[in-house]
A protein has these predicted regions:
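Periplasmic/cell-envelope proteins involved in peptidoglycan metabolism and beta-lactam response
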Residues: 1-335, 429-438, 552-556, 571-577, ...
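Beta-lactam-recognizing serine transpeptidase/beta-lactamase-like catalytic domain environment
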Residues: 3, 77, 258-272, 276, ...
Length: 665
């Protein structure tokens, strides 16, 4: 008996031990599997990542793009938020059809009155159709349920034989795709009104997602649009492109959790990083001056039926660009608009405005005396070296000196002077070296970031016609410069021989804090000797008093202006259709203490009754800019006190000065 009991006990212990072993093995297997899943299984990790990526995603929080401002702080380009309400018509908050219809009908009336694009009935119909399309009841079936919950109520129902009731239930099909309900995006002020409307005020729950978009707007319209620029599908140019990184700022990021299709909520924490808005770019542009330049240039282009034109106003001592207008025609008969940045991107033969470089070369490098005279043959064509048919555009001059040649813009004079000193003597290389190294005309002026085209002035004289090239270079052909390079060159003469780079951006700001300030760079401390500087300054004044610009500046009684005009015939594929010209005028003023330099360049076609020479073509625009700047700077002319000493005009534009003084008394 004892043996049987002992045997039974041993069997039981054996079985228990076996069970222990089995449980331990099972536990070890489960543990090993967990370790494998957690640490080594690529498939499980992949599936877990996929599941997490469907629920949690990293959202980029876009930084607000910085603004581009005028020198006075007026916005030229800025970003504003636009809003759209994307509705989830399958949201459980809208399951009550009666409440939804009441609220949506009220919203429809308010939206119809706000946007005035369609009737309230159309809005209401749209809401109901979208709700019916995205929220559907299917597979209807009856189900039985207890009518009451408490035991006493159930007892009474049983006594009445009404313990159970039948209800029809449905499965639902929900499409959570967002639907935009506004006919257009709205701004912040409009959204503050709309958010108080039914449904939009969350009175039926979170049934929509507010979509924000950062939109770029240009408050000044087309004014300086080519200089301001653009980024995106329509092109990348101007300040918008040049300062893309500074304006863009740094985007932030946040973790968001999927709530329904198209709807997400941000998760607190989760590596959240706030965005850093972009810098504001403060330009040197004067908004009033830019407006005057645009209107004056547009008026002249329309009056002369021209092709395109550009006007630049530059401050002499700082190099700041106060205005830069670029207008081109859309087609042959279209209106003018900011089509291309001609000031920076058009490198063309400048014509007689290049004679300033020839003047400095003759005076400084060749040591020519201003009294040197040449016969210009009264406007008849002459041969100078290997170049034939060199002629002046006017008659009346025979033997003239240096100053008269500048005032009348004589091609023959400068062609002969350059050929005699650099052609006959075989010093062509010295001529081009002086233009490049001393006058710095072969280099850009520092606006490459904005699309400045490099100039073209030869340094290689191994060409088929080096003599002809030398002669033509003397009066502005066979060289190519952009208008910005020409005005920088003339500004150096106004600035006492010191050439500085033009500046279009003053500073980068974040709020009221200046992060970086920009100033002009010295390109050449002196491009000429003092004697040559005084001589060319005197000659440029003569252009305005008795030369090709005298029509516009001869009678400026209180303001002395120095200028040079230029005309170049354009030779390209269009030459068979007619004659095309580039007319220019570059001026600085006041001549005795220069503060501003102005350039206008216009391309046109020779037409009956229309101008194509530089003076009459560009002069009216330059004249308008000079007058406007002078009239708005009251510190240039003194005030006459009511009870002060008598004052008489020193000069008058016309008439008898004795009678003028008598009237003044």
């Amino acid at each position: 008996m004892k043996e049987e009991r002992s045997k039974i006990k041993s069997d039981i212990l054996l079985r228990v031990r076996l069970l222990y072993v089995l449980f331990i093995l099972a536990g070890l297997t489960v543990f090993a599997r967990l370790v494998w899943v957690q640490l080594f299984s690529a498939e499980v990790a992949y599936n877990a990542d996929r599941l997490a990526s469907r629920i949690f995603t990293e959202e980029t929080i876009p930084a607000q793009r910085g603004s581009i401002l005028s020198r006075g702080g007026a916005p030229l380009a800025t970003s504003i938020f636009r809003y759209q309400a994307a509705f989830d018509f399958a949201s459980p908050g809208l399951d009550s059809l009666k409440t939804f219809r009441e609220q949506s009908d009220s919203l429809a009336k308010l939206l119809a009155a706000f946007f005035r694009d369609k009737s309230a009935a159309e809005y209401s119909r749209k809401f109901r159709e979208e709700h019916a399309r995205r929220y559907r009841l299917v597979n209807g079936r009856d189900t039985t349920y207890l009518r009451s919950e408490g035991w006493f109520s159930r007892l009474m129902d049983r006594l009445r034989g009404e313990e159970f009731a039948t209800r029809r239930i449905y499965d639902t099909i929900r499409d959570h795709t967002p639907v935009n309900i506004f006919p257009r995006e709205v701004d912040y002020a409009e959204w503050q009104t709309l958010r108080r409307y039914p449904l939009l005020n969350w009175n039926m729950g979170m049934v929509y997602r507010l979509v924000e978009r950062d939109q770029r707007v240009y408050p000044q319209g087309e004014l300086a649009r080519r200089t301001i620029g653009l980024t995106g599908d329509k092109g990348n140019y101007g300040l918008e492109e040049a300062y893309r990184e500074e304006l863009a700022g740094r985007d932030g990021k946040a973790l968001r959790q999927r709530i329904a299709r198209g709807f997400y909520g941000r998760v607190a924490g989760g590596g959240h990083e706030d965005p850093e808005d972009g810098y504001d770019v403060v330009t040197t542009l004067d908004l009033d001056l830019q407006d005057v330049a645009d209107k004056a240039l547009r008026r002249q282009l329309e009056a002369q039926n021209a092709i395109w034109g550009t006007t630049i106003v530059m401050e002499v001592h700082t190099g700041e660009i106060l205005a830069m207008a670029n207008l081109g025609r859309a087609g042959t008969e279209g209106a003018f608009y900011e089509r291309e940045n001609y000031a920076l991107g058009r490198s063309m033969e400048p014509g007689s405005t290049f004679k300033l470089a020839t003047m400095l070369t003759l005076l400084d490098d060749a040591d020519m005396s201003p009294q040197t005279a040449y016969d210009t043959h009264n406007g008849d064509p002459v041969t100078v070296g290997p170049a034939k048919n060199i002629r002046d555009s006017h008659r009346g001059d025979h033997v003239i000196d240096f100053r008269r040649a500048v005032a009348s813009s004589s091609n023959v004079y400068f062609a002969k002077a350059i050929w005699e000193r650099y052609g006959i003597t075989g010093k062509k290389q010295e001529y081009s070296d002086f233009l490049h190294e001393k006058l710095r005309l072969g280099q850009t002026v520092g606006l490459e970031r904005l699309g400045e085209r490099a100039p073209s002035i030869t340094t290689d004289w191994k060409v088929p016609d080096p003599g002809v090239m030398l002669v033509k270079m003397s009066y502005g052909y066979r060289v190519r410069l952009a208008p910005i390079q020409m005005i920088t060159f003339y500004n150096a003469i106004a600035n006492g021989g010191k050439m500085i780079s033009p500046v279009l951006v003053r500073e980068l700001r974040r709020g009221d804090r200046v992060e970086e300030r920009f100033e002009s760079r010295t390109l050449a401390s002196s491009i000429c000797s003092r004697s040559a500087l005084r001589e060319v300054q005197r000659c440029l004044e003569l252009v305005c008093t008795e030369g090709t610009a005298s029509l516009y500046f001869r009678d400026t009684a209180r303001l002395r202006v120095a200028a040079k005009t230029g005309t170049a015939q354009i030779t390209d594929a269009r030459s068979r259709e007619g004659r095309y010209y580039l007319g220019s005028m570059i001026a600085y003023f006041p001549a005795d203490n220069p503060r501003y330099t102005v350039l206008t360049t216009i391309e046109t076609r020779a037409q009956a009754g229309k101008a194509y020479y530089g003076g009459p073509l560009a002069g009216p625009v330059v004249k308008r800019m000079v007058d406007y700047i002078y009239n708005r700077n009251r510190d240039w002319y003194g005030r006459v006190e009511r009870h002060g000493p008598r004052r008489h005009p020193d000069r008058i534009k016309g008439g008898d000065i004795a009678q003028i003084r008598r009237v003044a008394d």
